A protein has these predicted regions:
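Feature marking long nucleic-acid-engaging regions of large polymerase/nuclease enzymes
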Residues: 1, 41, 46-258
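Extended, highly charged clamp/arch subdomains and adjacent linkers
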Residues: 1-43, 49, 187, 191-196
């Protein structure tokens, strides 16, 4: 029998012991997701449901590396857990945030990828300046609802905030870290503030991003999950702000390389 708004009260009066009642998934339900072939532990992870329109599975792109998912026709499988014991086990052992670190090499397998990396690079490499409206727009998908003190005033007398300052808003206040970026410059973070350097793959990327790896090991999986979500959102806002495109010439091998 299908339960509808018209017959739900009548069926509620008729329901008896041993009836099996099924329902649709709702926001917050825990399910298991996987992509074949499931070759390692992180090939099968637990996710919380967000019900959306249409008939395709959608997932946060930062979890693509452990699934080896690349959107070229991959088939994903979802399994709805049927009892409380299974749901509890999934929440404790199989949630995505519990799989950030790879058991194979000990570093983070989950982190920023592709356009996220381009976005953080554009945001921090030349340390561009943003107006109050622009800064709030970049941070609107994060927990930050109030800007820090401005970095300066432009020629028109308007306050501005730099890209490194906006990135720093996502870091713990007591984080101290230094390393060399993929771009070859020194990255220095003191008391949760990015002092110098470019944030790229070696900083926040999957498979060994220094910031993600440090947050996971020293601040815990929950704090790392929040950072990964927020840096992905900030990076996408940044790349949309600057614009980013490639052409066929970008695929050509330069003469010196030949």
């Amino acid at each position: 029998l299908k339960v509808t708004e018209k017959n739900c009260e009548e069926l509620a009066e008729k329901v008896e012991a041993d009836w099996e009642v099924n329902r649709h998934l709702v926001d917050g339900d825990i399910v298991i997701f996987n992509r074949q072939p499931s070759l390692h532990r992180m090939s099968i992870m637990a996710h919380e449901v967000v019900v959306m329109p249409y008939k395709t599975f959608r997932l946060n792109t930062v979890v693509c590396p452990p699934y080896n998912a690349d959107f070229d026709g991959d088939e994903m499988n979802m399994h709805a857990l049927q009892n409380e014991e299974a749901r509890a086990e999934a929440r404790v052992l199989m949630r995505v945030q519990e799989q950030i670190l790879s058991p194979r090499f000990g570093g983070n397998i989950i982190g920023a990828i592709q356009d996220h990396i381009s976005g953080t690079y554009l945001l921090t490499h030349s340390n561009p300046e943003f107006s109050e409206t622009q800064a709030l727009d970049l941070l609107r998908a994060t927990r930050v609802d109030e800007l820090p003190e401005a970095d300066g005033v432009d020629d028109d007398g308007r306050e501005f905030w730099t890209g490194r300052t906006l990135f720093s808003e996502l870091l713990p206040d007591d984080l101290d870290l230094s390393f060399t970026s993929s771009a070859g410059d020194s990255v220095v973070i003191e008391d949760g503030q990015l002092i110098e350097g470019t944030i790229d793959e070696d900083a926040v990327g999957a498979f060994g991003g220094e910031v993600v790896d440090t947050l996971t090991k020293e601040y815990g999986e929950t704090r790392a999950r929040v950072f990964i979500n927020e840096i992905a959102s900030l990076a996408m806002r940044a790349i949309m702000n600057f614009g980013f495109s490639i052409g066929i010439d970008d695929e050509s091998i330069p003469p010196e390389a030949e």
